Amino acid sequence: GQPLGATFRATHTTTFIALKPGLLTNDGPDYCGDISVQRLDIDCPACLPPLGHSITPALFAGSLQPRPRNTHKGRHGDAGVLGGDTGMVGAALLAGRAALWVGSGRVYVGLLDPGAPAVDPGRPELMLRQARKLPEQLTALAIGPGLGTGAEAATMLAAALDADCPLVLDADALNLVGRDPALQARLVAREAATLLTPHPAEAAR
């Protein structure tokens, strides 16, 4: 996934037998354009196990169906976002907006910043509140955007890890887990669906 020496940006790239990780990671997508695979009548899975799986819109087609006209937000799940400490409220608001964008019915954003706004003017349907006042019953919870790494953040993360709802761990939630064996143990013990979204530095921790 790295350009070496004099490199041009292709509009199309043909690769043989199977996709290569470098075409899909780091700088690869910016240089490859549209990618096609020529199998050469070779069944790649019979040769080597895959190193990973690419994420494509088709994977989510069943979950991102257009809403019926005769519906309302209460029928499409309650998403929670927990984060937004002082100076980082925007990170939690962006996550909340993303939850709306992918179809969540109601989105609650719990903010740690005591001076956080009461409304997001860009998406006033977001329900903003103090972090400790998020509803207990959520369809899914994302924790970490702008969370910070203080004691209060760690306490809230521990409670989230103990909850039964599906959980997305991002940003500072990953930083906290990376340095705390007790949080790591809670993460390993979870039975509900759990998704980690690290960038390379967070993954390295």
Q: Over which residues does each language-model region extend?
A:
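Proline/glycine-rich low-complexity loops and linkers
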Residues: G1-P3, A203
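Small-residue (G/A/S/T)-rich helix-start motifs and N-terminal tracts that mark the onset
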Residues: A10-T13, A18-A171, N175-R205
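A conserved, positively charged/aromatic
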Residues: A6-T7
